[in-house]
Regions:
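Beta1/beta-strand and adjacent pyrophosphate-binding region of the FAD-binding site
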Residues: 2-16
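Short alpha-helical segment within the catalytic ATP-binding CA
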Residues: 18-19, 51
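A conserved short coil-to-beta-strand element within the FAD-binding core of flavoproteins
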Residues: 127-135
Length: 135
């Protein structure tokens, strides 16, 4: 592999790494994203996304591609082991222009962010690449 010089090295192509790489690239900050796995993970670990995260997706210019893949404005009922409700979450406001609770498929979000990173920003993303040390 040739030597690469960058301002920021991001280790991990999960949602956080992909968001960070996109945001830095949107401000013309050179970054390289590495991931030890062969691709993004195809099984969801996160299932809910809030309004402020949707604003970040909006700032990256891909909100319209993402909104049709989510279920908006859902609530939750929390039930104790003995079957009694102990909490109800039913958000109703759209303080930042989006509903506060939305369900999504994490692999869809990761695919969208990765495609945006590669096509819009022409960023360097390396899979099957492990971070070994820093000195």
């Amino acid at each position: 592999m040739k030597n690469l010089f960058t301002d920021v090295l991001i280790v991990g192509a999960g949602p956080t790494g992909l968001f960070l790489s996109n945001i830095l690239a949107s401000f013309n900050i050179k970054n390289v994203l590495i991931e030890k796995n062969k691709s993004t993970v195809k099984e969801p670990r996160a299932v809910s996304i809030d309004d402020e995260s949707l604003r970040v997706i909006q700032s990256l210019g891909v909100i319209n591609k993402f909104l049709n893949k989510i279920s908006i404005n859902y609530g939750s009922y929390y039930i104790s082991p003995n079957g009694k409700n102990f909490a109800v979450i039913e958000p109703t406001s759209k303080t930042y222009g989006f509903h506060k609770r939305n369900s999504f498929d994490q692999p869809d979000l990761e695919d969208l962010l990765l495609k945006n990173l590669i096509t819009k920003y022409k960023s360097n993303v390396f899979f099957n690449t492990e971070f070994l040390n820093f000195s």
